[in-house]
Amino acid sequence: MYLHKIAVNTEVFFMWNKIKQYLPTYIIGIAIPLTVGILAAALTRDSMDIYGTLKTPPLSPPAILFPIVWSILYVLMGISSAGVYSARELNPASASLGLKYYAVSLALNFLWSIIFFRLSAALPALICLIFLLYYIIRTIIEYIKVKPWCAYLQIPYAAWVVFAGYLNVGIWLLNQ
């Protein structure tokens, strides 16, 4: 019984050390996409009202749903990128490339908001979304070579961007 307690305590100790070691990485990993999202929202806040005036395609969710979904996605994206960064020694080339693709996807994500809302340019925003989806897929491909669960956390992001593409096309066609 005593040896079992020592083994459990040792395991808890090692687990706590691992958490302490990687916690800052995960906090930063989550903070990065959330900051990008907050910045994009702040820069497009005055233009968001346009969404309510547009003709939208079937299945268009209410505007209140977007910040909720994006917040969840940003947290998943941050956990995913932090997981790859923390395990980069497993496959340095794929980790590096995947994180670069992820950075490009964050930039495109930010640009889409500006193009669609601030510039009211649905077609250029759609082109931006196509590139965004490409970089998300590339990110997933590289992440899976490092930590598969990190790649899986990017799948909801890709799915939402496909849905955003559908909405973007619908808005573009219905509001010409």
Regions from the PLM with identified roles:
Residues T56-V69:
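Short aromatic-rich membrane-water interface segments that cap or initiate transmembrane helices
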Residues R45-L59, L90, N175:
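Membrane-interface helix termini and inter-helical loops of multi-pass transporters
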Residues L111-L123, W172-Q176:
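Membrane-interface helix caps and helix-loop-helix hairpins in membrane proteins
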Residues P33-D49:
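Alpha-helical transmembrane segments of multi-pass membrane proteins
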Residues I144-Q176:
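Terminal transmembrane helical module of multi-pass membrane proteins
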Residues W16-G29:
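N-terminal membrane topogenic signal
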Residues V75, I79-S113:
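Helix-adjacent hinge/juxtasegments
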Residues I115-A121, I137-Y152:
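Membrane-helix boundary connector in multi-pass membrane proteins
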